[in-house]
C-alpha cells in the first residue's frame, strides 16, 4: 500500500482501520478507527485535508482528490462510499451513502442520513438537506428518509466494519492496519473452499 508523504504531511492511519495494500494514500489524510478502505482506492490530500470518520467504508476504485485549498473532504461517521465514486471536495455528515459511479464536486455540504443514488452528479456548492435521497445529473430530491432508515444505514456501516474485524482475526500475518496481499489471496482462496 503506497502511503506517500506530500509537503511534509503523511497519512495518519488508526491502528484499528483496515486499508487494502492495493490502495494509495497521499498527503494530509486522516483515517479514523474502524474505517475500511478497499483495493484500488486513491485518496489524495495534496492541497487540503481529507478526514474519514469512524466506521466508514470506502469501496473499490473510489477517488478522493483535493484540487485546491478550498476543496477539503470531511466524511462523517458510519458512511458508505461505494465503488467508483469521485469526491473532489465536500463536507459529509454521519450515516451518508454515496452509491456507485457518483461524482461530487467542490464545496458540497451533505446532511446526515443522505443517500445519493448511482451515477449521479452533485454540482459545486450544493447543500443537500439531512435525510434526503438524491438522484440524477444534476441531482434532485426524489424522497425523504425516516429516522429508522438512517438507523438502518448506521447498522449497515457497522456490519461492513465488523466483517473486516472477523477477516483480520483469521489472518495470522495481518498488520494492525494493513491486509497484506498474500493474506488477502489466502482469504479469497479460503472462501472458495
How would you label these PLM feature ranges?
Residues 13-67:
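A positional/architectural concept
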Residues 1-8, 12, 46, 52-54, ...:
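Glycine-rich hexapeptide-repeat left-handed beta-helix
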Residues 80:
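Short proline/glycine- and basic residue-enriched helix-capping loop/turn segments at helix->loop/beta transitions
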